[in-house]
Amino acid sequence: MRKRTKFYMYSIAVLSSLGIFLSSCTRASQPVQKGEFDDKVVIQTAQNQFYPLMRAFSQLVDLYNKQFANTPGFLPVELQQSEKTNATSELQLTNNVVGSIRSNSPLVPNIILADLNAAYQINGFNRLLDLSNNPIINESYFDSDIYNNFNKISGSTQSSDKVYAIPFNLTTTDSLVFNKPVMNLLFSLVEQGGGTVDKNSATYKELHMEDFMEKIPNKKWKNLQVKSNEIYKGLTVDDKTFSNLESLFEFSKKFTEGLELKQTPTVTGQQRDLKVFMLNYGPNIYQKYLWSKLGNSRDSWLWNLKLQDNQFDLDFSNLKKTANQNTIGETYDFFKNNYTTLNLNDKQVLKSIYFGTGGKSDWAAWDIRNFDTAFGIASHVGWNQSVVSPFTIRTFRSTQGDVTQQDINNAKNNFASADDVLWKTQLTKLDKNNLN
């Protein structure tokens, strides 16, 4: 049975949420030969098996295939994660699929999780699925703010009521998360260096613990000391410190600059680099920061949709303004200038800020779990990866086969417990001088 090929994609860069774009991928004038993607529904993504969404999605696909296997007209669903697609970003996945369309390949998936750029590119091939008359997926089904973000792309018309993206999942990717034992060490060092820690602040009260040094495993945090008892004079750590991105950056740098190694370090050997502040999805964080500096509105952003001859196109007038170009340079310099390091020996450093690369090994939640970062910005859906949990016990072990009591003991000895980690809500304030 030859099926029509469709597309679904998601948006994470604009709304930090998942959405789906739909596309028809066959043309009567350009028939494609029967291939291995026929007679099934293929979903492709740039996310690997460690993404929380993929763990849930894969189980949902398995459940669907089992429950509907005997339904007339049933097509099995195959989820292809980045291990199969070899795409590690939405852009790369989009380029792969667009290349397959251009070459008239039979290996064009039915569903892909990507972004608005993908919808724009596929729309250029006239492949977006028209849902105008769909009784469920229409304007009334969505919140107006979400709908208005997904129903207009370059090349669409003013009168179009198509939904180019379907919101799939609303989850914050930038929650503030703390490793409580390491944070208490930071507080102690700030006070040793003449700084002030507001112990009446809500943040301190949530993070405070007495036996924090006993909870930190054999990490080089224990090799650190302040350069002098006045190095942090004038520094106050309070709720404002953790209320916005700029203050977090500045604190991370100042704290790192005030440290040195003890003359006789007690922890030796090569380990993973330590970080004061680690962030996931760095490009998205920078984009939001730049957005705030450019005016915090759609009209002041570097590019916008403009209507010309009843059709939307991209307008780059704001990008050409000298003031905005200067703002780009200033925001870049702010990120760059707040980065500093301290040599920890053994080819290891302490970094004031660090942008995780994701993939299979570089996530803020994982560093929080391993006591390798003090605080970070991470995806809240990754909570169970930031603490001792059935997932972390099963996944992060050296043995194979069934989980043993030794695996459980190793996790408890090396990973942060749920009581050692504090997750907060999304960090929405970026500019310390404009907290609106």
Walk through the language-model features, giving the residues of each.
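Membrane-penetrating hydrophobic segments
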Residues: M1-A13
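Glycine-centered hinge/linker elements that transmit conformational signals in sensory
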Residues: F249-S252, G282-N370, F375-I377, N384-P390, ...
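Hinge/lid segment of periplasmic solute-binding proteins
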Residues: L116-E214, K412-D431
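Pocket-flanking alpha-helical
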Residues: N86-D130, D143-I166, L176, T256-E260, ...
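Loop/turn elements at helix/coil->beta-strand transitions in domains of secreted/extracellular proteins
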Residues: D39-V41, G73-L75, S105-N110, K162-V163, ...
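Conserved N-terminal structural module of periplasmic/extracytoplasmic solute-binding proteins
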Residues: V14-Q121, D198
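Structural recognition of the beta-strand scaffold that forms the well-ordered cores
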Residues: V42-T45, N110-A114, A165-F168, D174-F178, ...
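Helix-loop-helix "hinge/cap" segment bordering the ligand-binding cleft or interdomain interface
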Residues: S156-N284, N296-K347
